Structures are given as structure tokens and as C-alpha cells.
Amino acid sequence: MSNVQRKRIDIRRPTLAELSSIRSIAMNALNGQSRNLSQKIFWHPLYLAVFGLVFMGIYRLTNMVEGNTKLRTFVLLILVSAVFLTLIEFPCRNVYAKISTEDNQPDGCLAEENLKHFYMARIDKERVIGIIGILPANAPGAYQNTPTIVHWTVIPKFYQYAFDLLDSALREAKEMGADVVSARVYSTDPMLKAFERKDFTPVVDEAFDYLSFFGLRRLVLQKNLSEQPGFENRR
């Protein structure tokens, strides 16, 4: 978590004028996950093996033609790395563009009617540092008639406030009369470990794209609110 000194933050529902900002923040966070995926794929053993073979092939070819110095080898390594990262960025962007499109459908978690079920966290009364959605059980995108957390996003510098947002969502779920709350995430989501720290456990772990070979998964996590201190059933 960040070492930034804690300040007072304001967590509230968005106004009508702020609803478009919710969607924009969520989309930007998904774009960030595409970068996480491209880096994850680059370091996958299979991808590294292909990279190594290509690099050695080019290295030997240039050595035969002109000879290689340490500087030339270093520059060659950088260039080949950049090409391999660029090649994998395109399919990663495409898969998250597809996710964004699905989320913005009338039955998706960012459907127009769902934006009012988000919370925004502001610091110094103006700067938005994070959002979290807590969809009612009957809302589009909710998982099997349970209140469902979606698009929990916090600026990395302000991660120390992340659990304030999550607690707001959990309280909302409890006020809905729920004993179980779900969360929809992807394996590239930087907040996944934070969910695990709060005792969310996976109930769905599925491959949904050919990039799942490299570890991309669609997850649904759940948490029993009756076992959460401070969230006893108040029905």
C-alpha cells in the first residue's frame, strides 16, 4: 500500500453529471489491464522461448555479416524485445476492447442503469481517486441473483484508500439483505490480491479467449457477509 499520508476522503454516489466519468474511469482501467496481460505473456516460458530463438537467429545473422560488439548486441536485444512486446499488444488490446463492448451492452455491468450503483472516492473534495460498483441482485451483469461488485478501481498512488471503497460496497450489499456478495474480475486485475485479502474465494475460473493459454481468466469471487466482522445481518 502507498505511504502517502492518509487524508479525509469523500465516498458517495455519483451525480447525474458524473455518470459518464464512471464509464470513462472503468474503461481506462481495462486498458491498463491489457498492458498487464501483454507483460504477462512476454514473460511466459513459451513466448520467451520463441523470443530467444528469434533473437539468436538475428544475432548469428548479423554476426556473420558485420560482426557483433557488446553495444550492437545490446541494441539488438532492445529492438527485438520492443518488436515482441508490440506484436502482443495488439491482441491484448483487442480482447479488452471486446470486454469493454460487452460491459457497455444493455445486459452488461456498465449498462446505463447500473452507473447509479457505483461509488466514487474523492480526495480534497475534487480529485477522483477510485470507483467501485455494487450491482443489486437483479441488475444487468449481476452474478446469479447476488449483489455483485464490478470495476473496483483505485489510482495506485492512493491504494491505501482502496478498502474504504470496498467497505462501502459491502455495507451496501448487506443493506440489500444479502448474506453473500459476488465480484466479477479478471486475472489481470491489480485489485485481485486485495479481494483475496478480504477473504473472497473463486467460484468461477474460466478461459474465454485463446489468450487464456497465457493465463488470462475470467473470475467470479464470493464472500460470505455473515462471517465478516462488522457486517452482521441486520434484517
Curated annotation (Swiss-Prot):
GO biological process assignments: endoplasmic reticulum to Golgi vesicle-mediated transport
Record-level GO cellular component terms: endoplasmic reticulum; endoplasmic reticulum membrane
Pfam families named in the record: Pho86 (PF11124)
Transmembrane segment boundaries: 41-61, 71-91, 129-149
Oxidoreductase in keyword set: no
Residue ranges the record marks as coiled coil: none
Record InterPro entries: Acyl_CoA_acyltransferase (IPR016181), Pho86 (IPR024297)
Chief localisation class: membrane
Compartment annotation: Membrane
Signal peptide interval: none
GO MF term (any one): L-cysteine-S-conjugate N-acetyltransferase activity
Recorded topology in the membrane: Multi-pass membrane protein
Record keywords: Membrane, Transmembrane, Transmembrane helix
Protein name: Uncharacterized protein C12B10.02c
Organism from which the protein derives: Schizosaccharomyces pombe (strain 972 / ATCC 24843) (Fission yeast)
